[in-house]
Amino acid sequence: GEKIVEYVETGQIEALEAEREALPVDMAALTRVEGIGPKTAKKLYDALGIEDLDDLEAAAEAEEIQSVSGFGEKTEQNILDNLPFAREAGQRSLLGAARPIGEEIRGFLGAVDHVEEAALAGSLRRWRPTIGDVDVLVATERPRSVTETLTDWDRVESVVESGPTKSTLRVAGMQVDVRQVDPAEFGSALVYFTGSKAHNIVLRNRAIDRSRKVNEYGVFEVTDAERADPDTRAGDRVAGETEEGVYEALDLPYIPPELREDRGEVAAADAGTLPDLLEEGDMRGDLHTHTTWSDGEATIEEMIEGAAAFGHDYLVISDHAAGPGVVADTGLTDDQLRDQLGAIEDAAADAEIEVLTSVEANVAPDGSIGDTDRDLLAELDLVVASPHADLRDGSDRTDRLVAAVEDPLVDVLGHPSGRLLNERPAMEFDPGALGAAAAKHGVALEVNANPHRLDLWGAAVAAAIDEGATIAIDTDAHDPSKFSYLRYGVHTARRGWATKADVLNARDVDGLWAFLE
């Protein structure tokens, strides 16, 4: 109690500040390196004075870490291998943190006088799992007026730079770049600043083949002399106001932002074979959720009510089975799971949506499914199996995941790679081989929509779907507010070219039961 009072009154806790001075290390950065926890970080500081990632890298390269007791050559190499991940993770924000900020800024700018249109751009618009900074594009003929209004906004923490065409700001701790363009050039600027760079290069080459050029200012008919002209607007502008117009001027249909990664989308657009992508409104239920019976924060009844309010037709309750990697004392024993089935049945009797029984079983290192009684698993409507332990050994674990989907009791493979964005890299596996096994055995592969996971990710979804696999998009919700994570999963699946037909829980209740049977 005293420390809370001290914090409220002074904004700090003296004992904690003293600890920090005694151990002046960048704990957040060091513990992002696989194999380093707070205790290890302290040990390295005491032995070698390592305070940050630069110190760590220098010590590892000088082969000093292997001299510290408890560390060997292999650990030292592991640290070097994992440093790039730790560095990048420190510079990138999660999609789930950045997207709401971007949408708030877009909404604010969209309502400003003289703004004709405002849109998100960059990796945020492509729904990448992590984001460098937030890019927003504004169409206006009065850029100075818009800049003044923007820099006066009370959500702006600081103005890094501001000019008539570009402002860089800090909002909610994130860097935001706002670019202002002439409405006649808004579409071409949006294509350009949405990216990816690789996608834009393919478009540029396509323009050259048509005696045209494309850049952020438009699509232009050009002579050879005009193409070489340093004036970027040289030539006869044939498109630029809308993205659709830009693609049309290159003889292409519109390509959704999630696909713009140079993974064959321009060739598919040219051939007329772009997929009819899944939409948020196609989703009908959630197959992976938790309650207070395990580590969730809402009761069975609250989760059912929340799912109904969200618009779902069905909900699967899949609390954790006890096992390695599951928070101590939160996983269900067989007896507790049997008791829960009765509680779910009672709650389902009064529910306006269909409620299915399940458990989130644990995928052991050999791919077998935890310790839950198999007769009990067979009684459930559906079994989700997920890896929770032994996620960091760095070797290829395709065999582990394939063994799990080969188990006849498994219906959904949850967060297959076990990754935690910016915290823990994905387990190594071959998504195509896993997709083929899942298709053969009638198991759905999960896109876990929690912004800390987004697992599977776009390229893995595409590889699995190419092998005939079915995808399940689940929120792993631990309370009803997390049902809104679903959109992150939907757009992640869209990055993998997923259609409604590819997604298990875009089917109605009858379609779900048909798959499970």
Regions found by a protein language model. Give the residues of each.
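Short hydrophobic beta-strand that contains or immediately precedes a catalytic carboxylate
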Residues: L120, D286-T289, I317, D474
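Core AdoMet radical
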Residues: V359-E360
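Accessory alpha-helical DNA-binding modules that contact the DNA backbone or grooves
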Residues: G1-L124, R128-G132, L137-K166, G187-S188, ...
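Generic amphipathic alpha-helical segments used as scaffolds and interaction surfaces in large
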Residues: G35, L44-A47, R92-G96, L190-A198, ...
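Gly-rich Lys/Arg/Thr-decorated short loops/hinges at beta-loop-alpha junctions or inter-strand turns
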Residues: A86-E88, G281-L287
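Conserved hydrophobic/aromatic pocket- or pore-lining residues that grip, position, or stack substrates
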Residues: L56, G122, H288, D319, ...
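Di-metal (Zn2+ and/or Mg2+/Mn2+) metal-binding site signature of metallo-dependent hydrolases
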Residues: G285-I300
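Charged catalytic cores and adjacent phosphate/nucleic-acid-binding surfaces used
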Residues: W127-I201, N205-D209, V214-M283, I300-G311, ...
